[in-house]
Amino acid sequence: MQVSVETTQGLGRRVTITVDKDVIENAVKSELVSVAKKVRIDGFRKGKVPMTVVAQRYGASVRQDVLGDLMQRNFVDAIIKEKINPAGSPQYVPGEYKIGEDFTFSAEFEVYPEVELQGLDAIEVEKPVVEVTEADVDTMLETLRKQQATWKETDAAATAEDRATIDFSGSVDGEEFEGGKASDFVLAMGQGRMIPGFEEGVVGHKAGETFTIDVNFPEDYHAENLKGKAAKFDIVLKKVEERELPELTEEFIKRFGVEAGSLDGLRAEVRKNMQRELKGAVRNRVKTQAIDGLVKANDIDVPAALVDGEIDVLKRQAAQRFGGDEKQALELPRELFEEQAKRRVVVGLLLGEVIRTHELKADETRVNALIEEMASAYEDPSEVIEFYSKNNELMNNMRNVALEEQAVEAVLEKAKVTEKATNFQELMNQTATA
């Protein structure tokens, strides 16, 4: 086997391989012998067909299969010999072949980039320092009450906390536009579902009133014909409802798994859950900054094959989230996922190099701690832990999570980490919008 390697462009490589004619002929003969033992041809007993007849009938297809197999096997041997690390499958380009002669083919593919980590000591990370206060617990209890609230119709003017049922009809420059009209639309105030100024225009009005509000569509509005345009909405306010919050009774408290039904017990449970959320939010905030800094400090080329594979993964994940099938997923425009896919590949390559250079392996103690932390959010943590322990795929996924955390910690050891005091709500808001 003769091998030559050349760089085509960037990470692209072309390996040209020549296979000796004797290797081909021996492989063809061996395969024909195997075929002769199995085929049935009229006039001959099974296994007794002369080789000349077998070769005449099956020689061409056997030779084609042998050449395909030899291309794959010789490619693998070549990249091992040349110490090449391909990213993705190669594209084979067979040369002209004549029986009794050597066979030359080429394989085109991309390689993984050579990553040499740099700039780790210039990465800046702000670590949030937060405590769950009694006021934070009070706010969370109020949120729980709102989630369990009922709605009661009122004659009072609508407030920013109410729910309104309206008919509306919008126009721009006196012309109605698509999607600008609805009847019996239930508007929950404070959720930001409408364009800026719409909810504010409803506040202060009572059921039975008809009025017009003036608003402006944002410059980044999704409909091109409405971006930045001034609009009028004619509104009929049909019903206003106000929240009725439940009292913190024993019955209410027991809904959240606090069997004793005591307020102190509920506060303790809420605090525990908030502290778990806080721990995860701080960890993710620090991790995001560390990875952002790592990516910024290391500009690397990425193999298109890896990006394509990641795009397919993201498409399938999107289909699962929105109830589509795999065929529909693959038809989604790749442009929707390309940037995210490329970043995921870059992050994977960089963290992989951190893991390699630091000789990291998943810490089983950390793996178990992560499983226990995740399981603590369920009603029966021991059942979840046991389920994980018996599922190799889930355990390996958790080992990958642990290994990624260890890699991030290795980056943080060299980064400039400062602490910044903040509060629970501010951190949660940052996490939600990240």
Curated annotation (Swiss-Prot):
Keyword annotations from UniProtKB, A to Z: Cell cycle, Cell division, Chaperone, Cytoplasm, Isomerase, Rotamase
- Quote the EC number: 5.2.1.8
Q: What taxonomic lineage is listed for the species of origin?
A: Bacteria, Pseudomonadati, Pseudomonadota, Gammaproteobacteria, Enterobacterales
A GO cellular component annotated for this chain's UniProt record is:
cytoplasm
Protein's name in the database: Trigger factor
* Role, per record: Involved in protein export. Acts as a chaperone by maintaining the newly synthesized protein in an open conformation. Functions as a peptidyl-prolyl cis-trans isomerase.
Q: Which SUPFAM superfamilies match?
A: FKBP-like (SSF54534), Triger factor/SurA peptide-binding domain-like (SSF109998), Trigger factor ribosome-binding domain (SSF102735)
Q: Name one GO biological process term.
A: chaperone-mediated protein folding
Domain comment, in the record's words?
Consists of 3 domains; the N-terminus binds the ribosome, the middle domain has PPIase activity, while the C-terminus has intrinsic chaperone activity on its own.
**Where does the protein end up?**
Cytoplasm
Coiled coil residues, start to end: none
Q: Which InterPro entries match?
A: PPIase_dom_sf, PPIase_FKBP_dom, Trig_fac, Trigger_fac_C, Trigger_fac_C_sf, Trigger_fac_ribosome-bd_bac, Trigger_fac_ribosome-bd_sf, Trigger_fact/SurA_dom_sf
Task: Name the protein family.
Answer: Belongs to the FKBP-type PPIase family. Tig subfamily.
Q: What is catalysed by this protein?
A: [protein]-peptidylproline (omega=180) = [protein]-peptidylproline (omega=0)
PPIase FKBP-type domain location? 161-246
Q: Which GO terms describe its molecular function?
A: peptidyl-prolyl cis-trans isomerase activity; protein folding chaperone; ribosome binding
